[in-house]
């Protein structure tokens, strides 16, 4: 399992569009084979910056998603809302404390 973090910097006037669109596709993404968890975070100081945080079973699942028809529908539209190019990281969890 690994974690995928994607930073999305949106045009300020497109934040509402992003949130509405995400609401329509979030369940499809979350239930894509291999996706185990999905959250979206919003920066407290810059309200047009979001982070998606997802757990994937393995890298082949994420690659399959990125080549899927679903991603092909989501990503081109989402990119039209960007102020800056998206940044993405695939990371392994090192420590969890509760």
Task: Give residue ranges: language-model regions.
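Glycine-rich beta-strand-turn "strand-cap" elements at beta-sheet edges
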Residues: 39-46, 76-98
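Non-catalytic surface loops within mature trypsin-like serine protease
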Residues: 10-12, 58, 92-95
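Short linear/disordered segments characteristic of secreted peptide precursors
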Residues: 8-10, 22, 81
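A generic structural signal for short beta-strands and their flanking turns/coil linkers
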Residues: 4, 34-36, 84
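Short amphipathic alpha-helical segments
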Residues: 14-37, 70-75
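Short conserved AdoMet
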Residues: 30-33, 57, 83
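Short, well-ordered beta-strand segments in beta-rich or mixed alpha/beta enzyme
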Residues: 2-9, 39-66
């Amino acid at each position: 399992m690994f974690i995928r973090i994607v930073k999305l910097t949106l045009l300020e006037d497109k934040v509402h569009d992003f949130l509405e669109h995400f609401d329509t596709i979030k369940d499809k993404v979350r239930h894509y084979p291999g996706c185990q968890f999905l959250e979206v975070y919003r920066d407290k100081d810059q309200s047009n910056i979001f982070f998606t945080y997802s757990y994937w079973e393995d890298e082949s699942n994420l690659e399959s998603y990125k080549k899927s028809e679903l991603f092909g529908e989501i990503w081109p539209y989402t990119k039209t809302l960007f102020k800056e190019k998206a940044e993405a990281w695939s990371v392994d969890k090192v420590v969890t404390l509760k």
